[in-house]
Amino acid sequence: LDDFPGLSTVYLRLPWAFVQPGEDEYNWEVLDTPAQRWIQAGKRVAFRITATENWMQSGTPEWVFRSGAKFYEVNGYKEPEYDDPVFLQKLDAFLERMARRYDGNPNVAFIDIGHFGMWGEGHTVLTTPVHGKKWGLETQKRIIDLYCKHFRRTQLVISDDFAGHDAPVVHSPIIDYALSKGVSLRDDSILVQ
């Protein structure tokens, strides 16, 4: 911490599969244990839970697919069909439980909307060329709406990459929609395209 003067928030990104390994099984310790280290040092934490990672077979728990959620195989990993009703139902239930635990917690600076696209950053530019599926604005809105439904006190943020790879962020329909819902923007850099 001493190497980063002014550091106020530590950001944790984890796959959904790590946090909910079974339908009725929650492993909150994977968030809480590292978070406590920073909270005890007077810092806050922020979370992004992802559905797709390219460093593991499935960011989405396998039980979601066994329940009937559709997916695509992409270079050795699975990408969920983000507008699949089963996927959305399981995500809705997960977010309800996550919000019950973290919404309004003063140690949580923000929650990053993360269940869409690679690394939860909203882009599918790496996967669409493989399987040919493109998700539109309505799918992105559904994901945003699920988060807004459950997180009413803690600030929600969204990656500017939801606008699309190399797309202008200013007045992008999905960014405008997110902002209209009280969601703020986040970027891995200094908000540059």
Regions found by a protein language model. Name each.
Residues 34-45, 68-112, 136-150:
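An active-site-proximal structural segment forming one wall of the substrate-binding cleft
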